[in-house]
Each structure stands twice: as structure tokens, then as C-alpha cells.
Amino acid sequence: MAVKIRLLRMGKIRNPQYRIVIADSRTKRDGRAIEFVGIYQPKEDPSVIEVKSDRVQYWLSVGAQPSEAVQRLLEKTGDWQKFKGLPAPEPLKVAPERVDRKAAYEAEAKAAAGLAEAPTKPAKKAPKAEAAPKTEAAPKADAPKTEEQAGAGSGEQG
């Protein structure tokens, strides 16, 4: 029996997702598979390629032939070079770790709460100087008014 390592298409229209499968060469593209050995999601950035390396190595060793597309994927992951005894390829582009959305939300909420609380709390004022004489601060009632002070209080314009 001729065995192939090929892609089985899954997913939606315009959003393909593939499983890397071991199948008889005479079966349909999306037909029954002998074994599932990985996934390939080309629409992700970077593309997701997950392969069960030990199972692929086994199937290659017993004579399974990869399709052209699968062979390119195996070259990117380094499994093809491992099988052929060639030097390993350069490392793949790795997706950055995603930030936990709940933790990020809570951190933003705490930061916003900290900013909102700051204006509501009055700042501590410096204590007033008690040594300053109070006589200069408030004018005495029996002191004679100057012309400027007297004119400002009356409605006369001059």
C-alpha cells in the first residue's frame, strides 16, 4: 500500500486550516486518514505549524512519501533535514506571548482608580505660621481710612 503524508483541508471558506495526515494515496483529499500527525494554519501571523516529529520520522522511515506542500512544511520545522541527515534549518519566527486579557483589564482598572482617587483627596496644606502678627493681617476698625480706601467704598467717581 502506498502511503502519503499530505494535508487534509478543514476550516471555513477563505480561512483554511489543515491537518497533516498519513493516508493511503488512493483516498480522497478529505477522506479517511490513517493517522493525524500535525496541524497547519496559514492565516495566522506567523503561520502555525505543529508536527508530531517522532511520528513523522517513523512514517518517513517506513516509506511514506510527503506531498510537495507537506515537504516544504517539514523543511521549515526541520523534520525533513533530520530524516535526510542534513544540517538543521534556521529557527522559525515565533509568535509573541499573548497578554492575559483579564490581568491587563484589572491593571488598567487599578491605574484608572488610582488616577481618579488622587484629585478627590485634598493635598495636605503647610501649617500656617503662628508667629506672624495678626494686627497687620486685619485692619483695625478705629484706624482712619486713607483716601483710596474711602473712595473705593463710596459710589463716587472722580
Curated annotation (Swiss-Prot):
It holds the Pfam family Ribosomal_S16. GO terms for cellular component: cytoplasm; small ribosomal subunit. Disulfide bonds: none annotated. Residues 111-158 are annotated as: Disordered. One of its GO terms (biological process) is translation. InterPro entries: Ribosomal_bS16, Ribosomal_bS16_dom_sf. One of its GO terms (molecular function) is structural constituent of ribosome. The keyword Repeat does not apply. Residues 111-121 have a biased composition (Low complexity). The keyword Transferase does not apply. PANTHER family: 30S RIBOSOMAL PROTEIN S16, SMALL RIBOSOMAL SUBUNIT PROTEIN BS16M. This is Small ribosomal subunit protein bS16. It comes from Salinispora arenicola (strain CNS-205). The lineage of its organism: Bacteria, Bacillati, Actinomycetota, Actinomycetes, Micromonosporales.
